[in-house]
Amino acid sequence: MARYLLLASTLLLAACSSTPKKPIADDPFYAPVYPEAPPTKIAATGSIYQDSQAASLYSDIRAHKVGDIITIVLKEATQAKKSAGNQIKKGSDMTLDPIYAGGSNVSLGGIPLDLRYKDSMNTKRESDADQSNSLDGSISANIMQVLNNGNLVVRGEKWISINNGDEFIRVTGIVRSQDIKPDNTIDSTRMANARIQYSGTGTFAEAQKVGWLSQFFMSDWWPF
């Protein structure tokens, strides 16, 4: 009995250790950065036009500082296809002629003693796997860090509450300032070390998960 209890405890601990951490909406890792800029001193000139607040028509308004907002256009499409097959054939044939002793056949019950053995095996296996995914949309993110070479570390998330659950999109990566378009957008395909996560929490998300017993049968713990 103690042996079965030990086995059950081991399986439960393994299941608990493999349970992923549930995402939270207020994750500090994705919190926006608010740069602290010194207040701008406005000289009282008596004019409506203030030179300190003017902007040139030819200035670059693309995001380039920590805290600036950049829109990432999600254009992700992946497709993977794999096929494998093998065939094994094996055969053996052995024949032993009747045994002679003293010039006559050795028999048992009037039946000559001989041996005939034939064996064959044919195994054929085939497997195919085809998977494709696509993700289109957009999400605004913050510039979290400006690297020494001018590249920008961007990170952001978007949460949408729908009925009994929440859906979220999270993105983080590194972009070049030269790849940012004039409308302050950049394609997700131009991001390096991109991490894009689209998932959800709540009743509908839980319904799509595999139960712990099914996970055990599909894991490496199942010996068969």
From Swiss-Prot:
Pfam families listed in its UniProt record: FlgH (PF02107)
UniProt membrane topology term: Lipid-anchor
Quaternary state and interactors: The basal body constitutes a major portion of the flagellar organelle and consists of four rings (L,P,S, and M) mounted on a central rod.
N-palmitoyl cysteine lipid modification positions: C16
Entry keyword annotation includes Lipoprotein: yes
Biological processes per GO annotation: bacterial-type flagellum-dependent cell motility
Function of the molecule: Assembles around the rod to form the L-ring and probably protects the motor/basal body from shearing forces during rotation.
GO molecular function: cytoskeletal motor activity
Entry's Gene Ontology cellular component terms: bacterial-type flagellum basal body, distal rod, L ring; cell outer membrane
UniProt entry tagged with the keyword RNA-binding: no
Name of the protein: Flagellar L-ring protein
Domain of life: Bacteria
Compartments, as annotated in UniProt: Cell outer membrane; Bacterial flagellum basal body
Lipid-carrying residues in chain (S-diacylglycerol cysteine): C16
Signal peptide: 1-15
Keyword entries, A-Z: Bacterial flagellum, Cell outer membrane, Lipoprotein, Membrane, Palmitate, Signal
PROSITE patterns for the chain: PROKAR_LIPOPROTEIN (PS51257)
Primary location class: membrane
Lineage, top ranks: Bacteria, Pseudomonadati, Pseudomonadota, Gammaproteobacteria, Alteromonadales
Similarity remark: Belongs to the FlgH family.
